[in-house]
From Swiss-Prot:
Protein name: Aspartate 1-decarboxylase
Modification(s) after translation: Is synthesized initially as an inactive proenzyme, which is activated by self-cleavage at a specific serine bond to produce a beta-subunit with a hydroxyl group at its C-terminus and an alpha-subunit with a pyruvoyl group at its N-terminus.
Catalytic activity: L-aspartate + H(+) = beta-alanine + CO2
Pfam families: Asp_decarbox
PANTHER family referenced in this protein's UniProt entry, alphabetically: ASPARTATE 1-DECARBOXYLASE (PTHR21012:SF0)
Source organism of this protein record: Campylobacter fetus subsp. fetus (strain 82-40)
Length: 115
């Protein structure tokens, strides 16, 4: 039997843009994606600390430093400047899950990784 576990998260990222006319997804700065072990087109859950919204979308690689942009319908669920948590999950065997540690990336208000 497999269980779903937290795989990684980007904690307290700041929304830098919201593009209603884009096809969909969340655009994330490539360096943040790498730090959080996120792949392009991977499904993620977005938790908006400002308004309590929780929704799912998928990742698109961003090019701008610190970029966190919600696209398409998801753009209606956030405001620029909102603080969000970007979460990914993974299914794994219970035995592996007992020893698994998720990747947690803490960022500042400019979406720079806190060392």
């Amino acid at each position: 039997m497999e269980i779903e576990m937290l795989y990684s998260k980007i904690h307290r990222a700041t929304v830098t843009d919201a593009n209603l006319n884009y096809v969909g997804s969340i655009t994330i700065d490539e360096r943040l994606m790498k730090a959080a072990n996120l792949l392009e087109f991977q499904k993620v859950e977005i938790l908006d600390i400002n308004n309590g919204e929780r929704f799912q979308t998928y990742v698109i690689k961003g090019e701008k430093k610190g970029e966190i942009c919600l696209n398409g319908a998801a753009a209606r669920k956030v405001c620029i400047g909102d603080i969000i948590i970007i979460v990914s999950y993974a299914s794994m065997k219970r035995k592996k899950a007992k020893n698994f540690s998720p990747t947690i990336v803490h960022v500042n208000e400019k979406n720079e990784i806190n060392e």
